[in-house]
């Protein structure tokens, strides 16, 4: 009787639990409607509005309730558009932009930016150049005016050019102290040898010492054209106001090329190769290994980003030890293989670099490469649904958290319009991520990793870095 009573009680308790789980009140709890809320949140993101001026300059904005705004000009020009003779000209101009314009000479530009409590920044990459200002939303008219002045009226006084040479040369010395920056420049130099993508953004020191006012003027007149520019804004910005301001200040930007000499991108070939810079005086070795990756618009990028998320990243300061979700991180901890590692997928217009960078002591290099290549081969042959689901969730989190604040959103708008021709909505990114499954990861990884020639760059105490032919043989498995 007692046992029967227990069974009846258990059955009635189960039925009560089932009734509770079907309760509309419980289903409204945040924890049980997280998926729906996530999708709805993506669909409720403000729309990116895009307009085009008569001269071809694109104006794009995303309005939000932020009291601040970030406004920037993105230009489709970088070191890959430069020649061996003028390599570094774009980086030089970026520095001169902070030193005044024809209308605001000397430190007048800096004082005017500071007077409204704004922050001016600029950067150059191999394909893009950007100038951006973050300020209060009420100062939008002044911000657009300042950006227009910087882009159209950079001061190229001989005295300022000479002064800036020394500044850039000192910066280059500081950059050389960053082993990670050096090894990635080495990786580009060997992977894209003989092509414009091999050129560093800063250019060689010989060019910095040699570039003249004429070189910089020619660079400006050749590349700073309206159809290659995007004026982007994010934050407390109304699109119509931004468009009106752009019409006032940017409509005079030229869209005509002298003698119809429209710059074009030269396709850059990838070469499986290596570059080694051995320096036993350094405490740790930096090694980067990469295969050729897809260009910006290639749909394979999403599956490859999921694959990179599965391999993950690691730093010796992390907690978790051998219980980290990344198999490579667990092996690295258990065997004390490295100080850190990270995967990367660097995309350009038609090509890219897909691989990993790690920092370790001299005696662990060979083992680290062995286990890294083992993870790549495993993804090519036996990626599972559970780890793909984990990778997709990691990618979702990175996608959302990256766009936190007006500056990251503004950068995403400007970069997206130059690379994709449009701003891809978060909801569309989510649908692309959702389509990825284990079969897709295996197929895409096999396409890019399996039996492919890698590019390898090593810097530091790298005596134990394996011979290239041995590294190449690790890019496939003999399966029977």
Curated annotation (Swiss-Prot):
Modified residues (N6-acetyllysine): 111, 138, 163
Organism: Rattus norvegicus
Keywords: Acetylation, Electron transport, Membrane, Mitochondrion, Mitochondrion inner membrane, Phosphoprotein, Respiratory chain, Transit peptide, Transport
Range of the transit peptide: 1-34
Entry GO terms, CC: mitochondrial inner membrane; mitochondrion; respiratory chain complex III
Residues with PTM N6-succinyllysine: 163
Function statement: Component of the ubiquinol-cytochrome c oxidoreductase, a multisubunit transmembrane complex that is part of the mitochondrial electron transport chain which drives oxidative phosphorylation.
Main location: mitochondrion
GO terms of biological process kind: mitochondrial electron transport, ubiquinol to cytochrome c; response to activity; response to alkaloid
Membrane topology of this protein: Peripheral membrane protein
The keyword Electron transport is annotated on this UniProt entry: yes
Official protein name in the record: Cytochrome b-c1 complex subunit 1, mitochondrial
Extent of the signal sequence: none
Quaternary structure and partners: Component of the ubiquinol-cytochrome c oxidoreductase (cytochrome b-c1 complex, complex III, CIII), a multisubunit enzyme composed of 11 subunits. The complex is composed of 3 respiratory subunits cytochrome b, cytochrome c1 and Rieske protein UQCRFS1, 2 core protein subunits UQCRC1/QCR1 and UQCRC2/QCR2, and 6 low-molecular weight protein subunits UQCRH/QCR6, UQCRB/QCR7, UQCRQ/QCR8, UQCR10/QCR9, UQCR11/QCR10 and subunit 9, the cleavage product of Rieske protein UQCRFS1.
KW Membrane (keyword) present: yes
